[in-house]
């Protein structure tokens, strides 16, 4: 004997549940008979909705990964100080941190070099200025990326996700959060400088 299809219609008039029973006598409370077409359409719609969400999430993750890579590349390009470029690869950052720690320990100068330049002794004041510039740069782009990632997670249209690019202007709460974080970081950096200069 063929099973009987049933459906449950919600307050909005949309089918919220479907199923099968052996006979009309076993229809669940609040349900009514449904056609085979209604039964199949319900599951097709659920499958389609799931597929769309899965695709959107995959596109978001891919875009976020791209933005992460762009963030790293942008940081590693470095900063300009006194007309010279200082790269900020992970090793470069470690080197600048080491110079800064040497200054904290009392060093008045420390050997280092700009991109394409020969090594020379940098004075403590220049090391401090380079360190501050480097930290501000890393903090800015890292915070910007984080806010951009949060913005991407709010997008519900695949085309909007695909349009996102690193360096685009943030808006609303995302820009406000970026500004707040940078203002806080600047205060902390100024406190460090003030203590070093006595």
Question: Which residues does each PLM region occupy?
Answer:
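A preference for well-ordered globular domain cores
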Residues: 2-4, 10-198
């Amino acid at each position: 004997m063929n099973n009987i299809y049933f459906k449950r219609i919600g307050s909005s008039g949309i089918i919220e549940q479907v199923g099968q029973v052996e006979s009309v006598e076993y229809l669940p409370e609040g349900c009514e008979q449904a056609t085979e077409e209604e039964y199949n359409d319900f599951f097709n719609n659920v499958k389609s909705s799931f597929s769309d969400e899965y695709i959107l999430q995959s596109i978001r993750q891919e875009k976020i990964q791209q933005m992460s890579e762009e963030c790293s590349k942008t940081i590693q390009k470095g900063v300009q100080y006194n007309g010279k470029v200082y790269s900020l690869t992970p090793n470069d950052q470690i080197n600048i941190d080491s110079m800064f720690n040497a200054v904290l320990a009392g060093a008045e100068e420390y050997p280092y070099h700009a991109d394409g330049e020969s090594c020379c002794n940098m004075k403590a004041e220049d090391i401090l200025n380079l360190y501050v510039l480097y930290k501000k740069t890393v903090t800015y782009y890292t915070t910007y990326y984080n806010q951009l990632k949060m913005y991407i997670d709010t997008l519900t249209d695949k085309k909007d996700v695909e349009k996102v690019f690193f360096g685009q202007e943030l808006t609303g709460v995302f820009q406000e959060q970026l500004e707040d974080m940078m203002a806080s970081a600047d205060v902390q950096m100024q406190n460090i400088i003030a203590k070093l200069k006595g």
